[in-house]
């Protein structure tokens, strides 16, 4: 009997170890309700690992030497100028779209809809599962009745990241020519129009932006600055991740109240509760072992649903540019960031490597230098 008990204990411990190893992916699969995902999804980026040691890639820009991320010497990128050699791979783009649709549907997951919630409903935060929030009247009023991207389709889309690599790029005019332009975290555009453009069709706003860029609206001056930025959106989609973490609740409510009080002309959207885990599940299944997807990667994943061709600007998670010059983390402020810090919730260099590989294969175009025709 004692031997049998020990055998059962050993079996239980073995199962526990296996569970801990695969808990992350198992949790994702459970939450997105895709029990067959791991076995049935074929990787759209199945060459990522086979190419992980390649140093050369064709990206639009000037002829540079190898770029080394000094914070992590194992990540090196030789970037050659040959924008004319890039060709869109429509077959691959369609394959990626089809595979992502097995995890999420951007048309539906881009926002919770008014018919699915009512004031007072309890929601568990995505990152603070033991914490809850009640759907406020203001939030309910701003929920869209239908998806802001329902039946939408665009020939070309630009996703504009916020890296300082955009400075002096002269990409503004090119960015504005795209059918649909996505920007991140209410980044300012007026003062940087030559490099980042002005057109905005969708802009994200993490709640932390209110603290970092608008001093938590401590007085009328900062509230007016935020209002000016919101009014400048002029009918664009304002995408607010309201259900991520408890710490953002008050900031989301402040913004909602301002929008309603001042009748700001924006179309608010609040991503579905399953979106982040579904996006992460897709990339993990394709062996891109991210922690938490950045806003830029989220936007790319969503854009595959409604964009024929996707162009990325301002994606550069390294402290030096192609010519070994310092690059600001954001083009518009002096914030510092540890790209390879273990404490970071993101794995930006790894994401960049994946996007770079997709650029090589023609699934997207990644611009990290000056745009064609820039002076």
UniProtKB/Swiss-Prot annotation:
One GO cellular component term: early endosome
Protein localization: Golgi apparatus membrane; Secreted; Cell membrane
Domain of life: Eukaryota
Active-site residues, record numbering mapped to chain: 346 (proton donor/acceptor)
Membrane topology type: Single-pass type II membrane protein
Ranges facing Cytoplasmic side: 1-6
Known EC number: 2.4.3.-
Gene Ontology MF term list: alpha-N-acetylneuraminate alpha-2,8-sialyltransferase activity; nucleotide binding
Chain sites annotated for binding CMP-N-acetyl-beta-neuraminate: 162, 185, 294-296, 316, 329-330
The reaction(s) this protein catalyses: [N-acetyl-alpha-D-neuraminosyl-(2->8)](n) + CMP-N-acetyl-beta-neuraminate = [N-acetyl-alpha-D-neuraminosyl-(2->8)](n+1) + CMP + H(+)
Pfam families to which the protein is assigned, alphabetical: Glyco_transf_29 (PF00777)
Pathway noted in the entry: Protein modification; protein glycosylation
Residues in compartment: Lumenal: 24-375
Main function: Catalyzes the transfer of a sialic acid from a CMP-linked sialic acid donor onto a terminal alpha-2,3-, alpha-2,6-, or alpha-2,8-linked sialic acid of an N-linked glycan acceptor through alpha-2,8-linkages. Therefore, participates in polysialic acid synthesis on various sialylated N-acetyllactosaminyl oligosaccharides (alpha-2,3-, alpha-2,6-, or alpha-2,8-linked sialic acid), including NCAM1, NCAM1 N-glycans, FETUB N-glycans, and to a lesser extent sialylparagloboside (SPG) and AHSG, which does not require the initial addition of an alpha 2,8-sialic acid.
Family of this protein: Belongs to the glycosyltransferase 29 family.
Name by which UniProt lists this protein: Alpha-2,8-sialyltransferase 8B
Gene responsible for this protein: St8sia2
């Amino acid at each position: 009997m004692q031997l049998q008990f020990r055998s059962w204990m050993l079996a239980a411990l073995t199962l526990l170890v296996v569970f801990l190893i695969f808990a992350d992916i198992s949790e994702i699969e459970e939450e997105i309700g895709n029990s067959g995902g791991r076995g049935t999804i074929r990787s759209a980026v199945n060459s990522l690992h086979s190419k992980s040691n390649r140093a050369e890639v064709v990206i639009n820009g000037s002829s540079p030497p190898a770029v080394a991320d000094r914070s992590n010497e194992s990540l090196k990128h030789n970037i050659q100028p040959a924008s004319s050699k890039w060709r869109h791979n429509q077959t691959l783009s369609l394959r990626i779209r089809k595979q992502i649709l097995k995890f999420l549907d951007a048309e539906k997951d881009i926002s919770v809809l008014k018919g699915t919630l009512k004031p007072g409903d309890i929601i568990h935060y995505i990152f603070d599962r033991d914490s809850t929030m009640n759907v406020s009247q203001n939030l309910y009023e701003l929920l869209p009745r239908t998806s802001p991207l329902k039946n939408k389709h665009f020939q070309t889309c630009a996703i504009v990241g916020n890296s300082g690599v955009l400075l002096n790029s002269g990409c503004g005019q090119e960015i504005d020519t795209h059918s649909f332009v996505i920007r991140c975290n209410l980044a300012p555009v007026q003062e940087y129009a030559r490099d980042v453009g002005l057109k905005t069709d969708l802009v994200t706003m993490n709640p932390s932006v209110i603290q970092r860029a608008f001093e938590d609206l401590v007085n009328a001056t900062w509230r007016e600055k935020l209002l000016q930025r919101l009014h400048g959106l002029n009918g664009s989609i304002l995408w607010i991740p309201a259900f991520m973490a408890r710490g953002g609740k008050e900031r989301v409510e402040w913004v909602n109240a301002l929008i309603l009080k001042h009748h700001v002309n924006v179309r608010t959207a609040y991503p579905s509760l399953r979106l982040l885990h579904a996006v992460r599940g897709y990339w993990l299944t394709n062996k891109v072992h991210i922690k938490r997807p950045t806003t830029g990667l989220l936007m790319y994943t969503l854009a595959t649903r409604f964009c024929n061709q996707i162009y990325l600007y301002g994606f550069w998670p390294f402290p030096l540019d192609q010519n070994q010059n310092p690059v600001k983390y954001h083009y518009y402020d002096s914030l510092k960031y540890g790209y390879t810090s273990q404490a970071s919730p993101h794995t930006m260099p790894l994401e960049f490597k994946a996007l770079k590989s997709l650029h090589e294969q023609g699934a997207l175009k990644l611009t990290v230098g000056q745009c064609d025709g820039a002076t």
